[in-house]
Amino acid sequence: MERRVLETTEDGDTEEDTAMALQRLVELTASRVTSVRSLCVQYRLIRKLGSGSYGRVLLAQPRQGGQTVALKLLRRDSVLRTTFLREFCVGRCVSSHPGLLQTLGRPLQTPRYFAFAQEFAPCGDLSGMLQEKGLPELMVKRIVAQLAGALDFLHGRGLVHADVKPDNVLVFDPDCNRVALGDLGLTRPEGSPTPAPPVPLPTAPPELCLLLPPNTLPLRPAVDSWALGVLLFCAATACFPWDVALAPDPEFEAFAGWMTTKPQPPRPPAPWDQFAPPALTLLQGLLDLDPETRSPPLAVFDVLGDNWGLQGSGEGSGSLGVIPYKDGEEEEGGSSLEEWTDEEEDEIKDSGGMEADNRAS
């Protein structure tokens, strides 16, 4: 499968080019979905990794050898075929970047599920690391630097992730030397009509929270910048800065009041006062209330070498260095899945308790 099809050209409308390229790829892939009924013949199902209204994620080992994978199953009675194909196609096209979770093999369908394989993150998701307190400064920097690179990669291909949150950041080692952004289910070409979130979300920017049905806004990279700023705050403090970026949320009102007061008070309101000036400047840019002047994700690198004032700045092993990536490098990954079956329903029930190592929500 051609994996750089979503790159845009210098001529023509970039947003239209990306949308058309993705649509063509979805149509092409639709004829290549493999209908199968013998999952347990091809894979040993180890345990359930996560589940939700979308379906479930399973840890599986190919019976003929190869890497352990996370199998994402989407219920056919609740997910449109085109939605499934779009997520798979986007995942395959951007899998060359180490900051984005690899999508592997071929798309499949059983009588109950659409399915595809992804690389398995053995340390779970970022939310599992934030149960009690924020992370040391070095780890926070590693995380946001890798995510900033991943988002810039997506944005350079005319795509917006639109669902950046701790649950969707997969962790590959305890020191966060590699993390990857997963769940591309809401990823769309830039400019796609986007409504308000169906439920209040702390990661949604105010311009979307203010929308009333049936109004929409064109999807912009600034949505990801805002969510990256919220995620930075979460990684540093183990909590969200607000419940929703909308009045009358008191935490958001305090932040917005400080951001809009002229001249701006020298000291920000709590809990923002725990950040050193370089980190605070970064957060002010990523969380700019005006999406037109909001900083891009790569603004992270402007202050990466500065002191952010976070706890445990001397903790953590190794250097700040993260996995390098050079645009243009391609890596084919994963083995295709050949056989599927709905017999997994009974086998999954016997495979042990649910663990949150990988999430698909």
Curated annotation (Swiss-Prot):
Domain of life: Eukaryota
Compositionally biased region (Acidic residues): 328-348
Stored SUPFAM superfamilies: Protein kinase-like (PK-like) (SSF56112)
EC numbers: 2.7.11.1
Annotated ATP binding sites: 49-57, 72
Keywords, comma-separated and alphabetical: ATP-binding, Kinase, Nucleotide-binding, Serine/threonine-protein kinase, Transferase
Keyword NADP applies: no
Catalysis performed (reactions): L-seryl-[protein] + ATP = O-phospho-L-seryl-[protein] + ADP + H(+); L-threonyl-[protein] + ATP = O-phospho-L-threonyl-[protein] + ADP + H(+)
GO MF, one annotated term: protein serine/threonine kinase activity
Organism: Mus musculus
Name the UniProt record assigns to this protein: Uncharacterized serine/threonine-protein kinase SBK3
